[in-house]
Amino acid sequence: MSSTVTAREVITSLIDAGQTVATCESLTAGLLAATLADVPGASAALRGGLVTYATDLKHTLARVPQEVLVEHGPVARETAIAMADGVRDVCGADWGVSLTGVAGPDPQDGHPVGEVWVGIAGPEGTGVVHAGVAELAGTVLGSAELLVGDRAAIRRQAVAAALAVMVQVRAG
C-alpha cells in the first residue's frame, strides 16, 4: 500500500467524521504533513504541523515536558506520546500524530538506526508504535521490524508506518 493511498484513506476518514489531525515530526522533518497535504481536499482535515528536529523544540513548540526529555531523551516512547499530545493541543486538532527516531547513518545516544516511534493522541486516548508494536487504549494493532535502508528510505517508511497506524486506528 503506497503512502499516497494511505494518506487519502486518512484524510477521507477524517473528513467523513468531521475531525482534524496535526503532526509533530522530528526525523521526518515535515514529510508526514506534506504527504497528507498532497491529498486533494486535505485542508478540511489537516490543521497543521510542527517540525521539532531539535530536541529543545520538542519542549518549546510541542510542550513535551522537560522531565520527559531529560529522563527518556528525544527518541523514546514517552517522548512520542508527549509530542502527539502536545501537537493535538497546540494545533487544536482531534488527532495528533508524532514521529521521532533515528534515520541514520549513525546510531544516536544508544538508539539504533531505524528505531522509530510513532505517537498518536486522539479522542479516545493515546498510543505508540515502536519497532511496529502498535497499541491504542491497550489494543494491539500490528507489528513490524526496525526500519532499514538509507536515511531517505527510513524517513519514507516512518511516514508509511504513521499513516498505516492512523488508518488502523480510524477503522476502529
What do these predicted ranges mean?
Residues 1-172:
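Short alpha-helical segments enriched in small residues
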